Amino acid sequence: MEKFELHILGCGSALPTTRHFATSQVVNLREKLFMIDCGEGAQMQLRRSRLKFSRLNHIFISHLHGDHCFGLLGLISTFGLLGRTADLHIHSPKGLEELFAPLLSFFCKTLAYKVFFHEFETKEPTLIYDDRSVAVTTIPLRHRIPCCGFLFEEKQRPNHIIRDMVDFYKVPVYELNRIKNGADFVTPEGEVIPNHRLTRPSAPARKYAYCSDTIYRPEIVEQIKGIDLLFHEATFAQTEQVRAKETHHTTAAQAAQIALNAEVKQLVIGHFSARYEDESVLLNEAAAIFPQTVLARENMCITINNYTDTRDYDPL
């Protein structure tokens, strides 16, 4: 099965702490890297997670609060110092290009690569990226400013050829692509060999959703129904529900309720408020509702294989 991993670079919220970096993640799908949000220190965390800068060509920004985008300028500058020549694409709600264009023109005048900004609306689900491996769609969220999450949907791989059966029926090589994609085979004598005799199904396509920052929003459940992995912000414990609503954030219990209602396979919670030195209170609160919950932590890597496992990278 081809690689589909989530790397947690940072899982803190707006106030910097010595425990957490600001929010940033990287999705590795078939060796293509996609960054989600880019808080301060993201480039340092890329190195610690042993991710290759050259494979990162698309960055998705959920909203224009500093803890989700202050790392962009440093990352763009570092790419330039490393001699990057490949285009970099940044996808965000409206306003990011207007904010960053003056900074780039001042600090990054000699870049040998182009930076393209792709801005989108946040009110409706919108397909914002599509290639042969993955489609990325926005998830409308409710925050104090326009904000959205992102749904990464792997493209279904073709069926696997059963070599012994292909040899038995003497299937020509030029027919194999058609058969992989579901076609039957007709022998020279006119016998129809059904596809299921010649192939076995590939593994089901996998899905990952990122939802931060947002007030409790049950409306997203249908869009993320049955996905393999959900990251949902859990800034506060339920005892701070009023504060969560005032600041347009979510409690751990509310994040777990979303996961439960959406029937996801695993939940990762993060974007922790700096007030919690012991985040087990958030984990316990969420796990009481949705047991398949884990706490995000820096340098965590989660493998998505229609089941999930986690590991940490030792910092370099």
Swiss-Prot record:
Cofactor: binding details: Binds 2 Zn(2+) ions.
Name of the top EC class for this enzyme: hydrolase
EC number: 3.1.26.11
The UniProt record lists the keyword Transferase: no
Cofactor(s) it depends on: Zn(2+)
Coiled coil regions in record: none
Binding locations of Zn(2+) 1: H63, H65, H143, D213
Superkingdom of the source species: Bacteria
Catalytic reactions of this protein: Endonucleolytic cleavage of RNA, removing extra 3' nucleotides from tRNA precursor, generating 3' termini of tRNAs. A 3'-hydroxy group is left at the tRNA terminus and a 5'-phosphoryl group is left at the trailer molecule
Pfam families, A to Z: Lactamase_B_2
InterPro entries: Metallo-B-lactamas (IPR001279), RibonucZ/Hydroxyglut_hydro (IPR036866), RNase_Z/BN (IPR013471)
Record keywords, A-Z: Endonuclease, Hydrolase, Metal-binding, Nuclease, tRNA processing, Zinc
The keyword tRNA processing is annotated on this UniProt entry: yes
Active site, renumbered: D67
Biological function: Zinc phosphodiesterase, which displays some tRNA 3'-processing endonuclease activity. Probably involved in tRNA maturation, by removing a 3'-trailer from precursor tRNA.
Protein family per UniProt: Belongs to the RNase Z family.
Known partners and oligomeric status: Homodimer.
Protein name, per record: Ribonuclease Z
Organism name: Bacteroides thetaiotaomicron (strain ATCC 29148 / DSM 2079 / JCM 5827 / CCUG 10774 / NCTC 10582 / VPI-5482 / E50)
Chain's gene name: rnz
